[in-house]
């Protein structure tokens, strides 16, 4: 006699009542973030698990491979959220639809044979070692797949080396080889014709050597450092509005791109402060600079955690950063088969 089990739900909602939130939120913060455990220098070296949202994401996956959505009172429009109810409803609907295996929208201008990769790093505590870092790749395809690949941990001395990077060509080659393997599994064993790698820090020689080795058979390759804090500003002469969204100025392998700004179709600038452009530096550039800018513009429209017109940073960078925060939770360290779909982390 066979055992019949119910399939997992597409999504599990976890509502937090106002009373629970009031009892558990951080009394030293004006936000509604729930206090899981107060961070101290000692605890940070031992157990990097302080974010309730991240801990719940890990728990939902570990105990049933569940996709979850935490619902706080502000999610339903209670309190001063700064958003109207229609915007809140749209954001909630878009996020829920994606988590329940839907694709809210696609962009036709993204090339079907291009693989977009965002690299990030996060802190991992394992076997009492607090000096470990791990690389993480967010892989995005035109069809809407948004996948996560975790690299191998490596030792890192932040006091002497600053921001993490892949310290050997082997580490760099390994994670990009895994990216290509993922692409081939989803594309009937076909390689991508073009691979674009985005990082929020400069590419090091060790990384470039390893990436080039892993991508030796790929026709077109671009390595782009995306700097969000360059301090550069452009001011149109005699104009009341800031530069138009999409303004792109380049020279050689460097460029400035406004992913936010005045939108002629809406006849307004939707921000409240002077927009800041992204500063781009290509460490390898097989594609025309205009194509690199167009890719980034398109990837700012694919954050399915809300229904916003666009975000300032492309999803290759923003999603990699968010997923890295969750992967650093100590309760995930004993999970070998961690989820690859972004739905589990959002």
Regions found by a protein language model. Give the residues of each.
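Long, contiguous domain-sized segments
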Residues: 1-346
